[in-house]
């Protein structure tokens, strides 16, 4: 059975959930300029280092370059990313993990907006902590520490 082209109706969400429960993984596509593909590739290398590739490939089909605001497009299982937003591979990878968590919540029928953002941010922080512990690159460790510090200084209500 093929993964639904769009994930919009109850039936499409149900089919997506069933396929994921059976172990379905997307062949992640990165669509954009060569500079965009390189920058997303660097972020994805960090996702691989932390061991989160399966998580992303379970819920995200495409990471696409756009000229508007970076965001999750649930109905397309896609992350839309503006090239200018890609300036720090650790932060970029964290954004991908955060949006993947939101997609997971959407498919599972959990609240994925409003206060659920806290859950997605916590997943992002978990990822950065894991990356910090798994990487051997001192510069990446430093960026992880800076990233975690920045996120700990942003209290949620």
Feature roles, as predicted:
Residues 5-7:
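Accessory helical-bundle/CTD segments and flexible terminal tails appended to RecA-like ATPase motors
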Residues 39-43, 92, 116:
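Stable alpha-helical elements in mature extracytoplasmic
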Residues 91-107:
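Active-site recognition of the HExxH zinc-binding catalytic motif
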Residues 108-147:
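Post-HExxH zinc-binding segment in Zn-dependent metallohydrolases
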Residues 147-156:
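Short, low-complexity, Pro/Ser/Thr/Gly-rich segments in the mature regions of secreted, periplasmic
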């Amino acid at each position: 059975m093929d993964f639904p082209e769009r994930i919009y109706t109850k039936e499409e969400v149900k089919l997506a959930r069933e396929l994921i429960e059976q172990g379905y993984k997307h062949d992640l596509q990165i669509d954009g300029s060569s500079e965009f593909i390189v920058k997303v590739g660097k972020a994805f290398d960090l996702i691989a280092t932390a061991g989160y590739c399966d998580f992303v490939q379970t819920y995200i089909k495409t990471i696409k370059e756009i000229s508007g605001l970076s965001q999750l497009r649930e109905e397309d299982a896609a992350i839309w990313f503006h090239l200018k937003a890609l300036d720090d591979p650790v932060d970029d990878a964290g954004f991908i993990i955060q949006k993947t968590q939101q997609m997971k919540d959407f498919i599972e029928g959990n609240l994925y907006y409003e206060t659920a953002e806290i859950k997605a941010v916590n997943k992002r922080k978990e990822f950065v902590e894991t990356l910090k512990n798994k990487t051997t690159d001192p510069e990446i460790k430093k960026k992880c520490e800076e990233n975690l510090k920045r996120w700990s200084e942003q209290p949620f209500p």
